[in-house]
C-alpha cells in the first residue's frame, strides 16, 4: 500500500516537515510495512521557500530588515540557480519572513500600525544581488497595509492630506495611515523595479475590500477589533481610489475588486504600483515544481492537512490543491486539521473524510504545545479505523 503524506504546516506550532513526520509515525503503528512517501507542501505562506528548495537548486541567505513593528529581524530568503523552471536569476522571498504574524507575540499584533516595509527591504536586497525574477510568497503576514510599506522601502512616497507644502507629508507606516493618503509619488522609485519580473504566490483569491476582502476576512486573526476592521477596509479603499485616480495601476477592472488583491493584507495593491506582476496560485506552483502528479502515481491514499480547515481552504489552500490533484488520478484523500471550522463540509467534494486533532476544550497555548502528540494520535486512530474497515469488508 502506497500512502502519500502531503500536508502544509500547522501555523504557530509545526512545520510541514514535522506534520508529515507525525502523520507517518501514527500510521506506522498500524501499517508498519506500507510504502510511505512524504511531500511537505506550502501555498505561498510560511515554509514556501524551504518547500520549493526541495525541488529547485538554490542557496538560503539571511538579511537584517525591519519587522512588522520596526524591530530588527534576520529574515531568510533564497537565490535559485538557473534551471528548466527558472531561466533567470530568481529569488524566493516570503512576506512571513520579514513581516510575519509569527514574529509578534499575540499581545503585540496590531494591523493598524504593522508595516510590510521589511519585505520591501528583502526585495531590494534581492535586486541588489542581481535577481531578475522574484517569487514572493504571500501568507502569514501581520500586516494590513496594502503593501504600502513595500512601496516606501523601494523609494515611493505616500503623501497625506495634511498639506504643509505643495507635496504634503509622508504617511506613517501601517494600514490605518492609508486613510489619510492624498497622493502617490513614484518619482523616487528604484529604477531597477521596472526590469524585475515579480511572481506572487498567493493562497487566497479574496478581493482587496468589502465583506470578503482583506480586512474583514483576515484582519481579526491579525488582532483587529470589529471597529478596526472597518477602519482598515476604508483605508485600503482609499489607497485603491487614489492609485486609480492618479493612473498608477493598469487594467479596466476596479482595483478593489480584483481577485487575489486581498492576500497578505492587500499586499498586491502596492506591488502592482511597482512591478510587472503576475499573481499565481501558490499551491499550484509548488505542486508543479515538486512534480506532485508523478509522486501521486500508484498511490492508494493521500493524507493532507493544515492548522485549520474551513471554507477558506477552498480558495487556494494546500489541502484542497493536493486533493484536487489526487482526485484526478482517482486517489482518495483524508484531511487532518487542528480544528475544523466554518462550512468545512464544502471540502467533502474532494476529500473522503476530515478529522480534527483537538479532542477536548483547551487553551490556545495548550493546543499549540500538544500539537505533535494530538496529531500523531489522530493519525494512528485514522489508520486503525482504515484497518478495521478492511477487515470488515474482507
Which ranges hold each PLM region?
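N-terminal loops that bind phosphate or other acidic moieties
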Residues: 1-138, 142-394
Amino acid at each position: 500500500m502506497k500512502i502519500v503524506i502531503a500536508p502544509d504546516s500547522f501555523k504557530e506550532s509545526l512545520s510541514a516537515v514535522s506534520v508529515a513526520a507525525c502523520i507517518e509515525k501514527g500510521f506506522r503503528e498500524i501499517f508498519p510495512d506500507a510504502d510511505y512517501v512524504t511531500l511537505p507542501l506550502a501555498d505561498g505562506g510560511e515554509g514556501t521557500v524551504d518547500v520549493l528548495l526541495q525541488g529547485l537548486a538554490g542557496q538560503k541567505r539571511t538579511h537584517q530588515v525591519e519587522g512588522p513593528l520596526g524591530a530588527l529581524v534576520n529574515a531568510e530568503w533564497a537565490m535559485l540557480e538557473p534551471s528548466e523552471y527558472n531561466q533567470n536569476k530568481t529569488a524566493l522571498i516570503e512576506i512571513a519572513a520579514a513581516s510575519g504574524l509569527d514574529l509578534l507575540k499575540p499581545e503585540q499584533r496590531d494591523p493598524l500600525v504593522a508595516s510590510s516595509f521589511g519585505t520591501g527591504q528583502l526585495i531590494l536586497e534581492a535586486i541588489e544581488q542581481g535577481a531578475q525574477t522574484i517569487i514572493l510568497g504571500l501568507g502569514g503576514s501581520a500586516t494590513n497595509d496594502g503593501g504600502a510599506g513595500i512601496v516606501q522601502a523601494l523609494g515611493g512616497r505616500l503623501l497625506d492630506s495634511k498639506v504643509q507644502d505643495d507635496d504634503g507629508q509622508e504617511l506613517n507606516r501601517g494600514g490605518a495611515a492609508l486613510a489619510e493618503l492624498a497622493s502617490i509619488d513614484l518619482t523616487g522609485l528604484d529604477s531597477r523595479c521596472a526590469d524585475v519580473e515579480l511572481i506572487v504566490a498567493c493562497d487566497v483569491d479574496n478581493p482587496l475590500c468589502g465583506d470578503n476582502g482583506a480586512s474583514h476576512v483576515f484582519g481579526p486573526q491579525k488582532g483587529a477589533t470589529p471597529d478596526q476592521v472597518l477602519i482598515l477596509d476604508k483605508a485600503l479603499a482609499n489607497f485603491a481610489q487614489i492609485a486609480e485616480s492618479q493612473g498608477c495601476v493598469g487594467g479596466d477592472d476596479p482595483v478593489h475588486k480584483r481577485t487575489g488583491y486581498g492576500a497578505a493584507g492587500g499586499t498586491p495593491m502596492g506591488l502592482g504600483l511597482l512591478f510587472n506582476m503576475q499573481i499565481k496560485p501558490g499551491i499550484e506552483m509548488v505542486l508543479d515544481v515538486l512534480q506532485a502528479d508523478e509522486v501521486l502515481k500508484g498511490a492508494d491514499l493521500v493524507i493532507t492537512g493544515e492548522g485549520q480547515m474551513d471554507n477558506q481552504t477552498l480558495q487556494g489552500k494546500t489541502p484542497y490543491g493536493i486533493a484536487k490533484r489526487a482526485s484526478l488520478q482517482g486517489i482518495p484523500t483524508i484531511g487532518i486539521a487542528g480544528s475544523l471550522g466554518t462550512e468545512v463540509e464544502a471540502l467533502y467534494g474532494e476529500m473522503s473524510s476530515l478529522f480534527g486533532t483537538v479532542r477536548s476544550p483547551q487553551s490556545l497555548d495548550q493546543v499549540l504545545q500538544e500539537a505533535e502528540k494530538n496529531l500523531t494520535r489522530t493519525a494512528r486512530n485514522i489508520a486503525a479505523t482504515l484497518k478495521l474497515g478492511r477487515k470488515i469488508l474482507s
